Amino acid sequence: MIRPVPTDETTMALQLRPNCEYCDKDLPPHAVEARICSYECTFCEDCVENKLHNVCPNCGGGFVARPIRPAKEWRPGLSVEKRPPSDKRVHLSYSLDDLAAHSARIRNIPPNITVAVLL
């Protein structure tokens, strides 16, 4: 049975943050270079690859390409117009030295490996 996607205001949608938290580059909803972790921390592709080495500075997980929310409302209530991106800019919570040490410590551990496996 096919179930319709709920489209009321209580439906959670991925938070589309407007900027890279590292370099503050604008990342509009259609930005193909936007990357997110499982907590929706948002960075540009350049910072993820060259500064963070695919290590989220907050949770320590890896990154994936952020999905692009459709501009056209193909289904009722589901579009960037109906579910707009956030306008709240987010910035790093840690110093650059701390980020470098954090990344160096865990960058060679795949994000899918649990701590229990490492012990």
Regions found by a protein language model. Name each.
Residues 9-119:
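Intrinsically disordered, low-complexity regulatory regions in eukaryotic proteins
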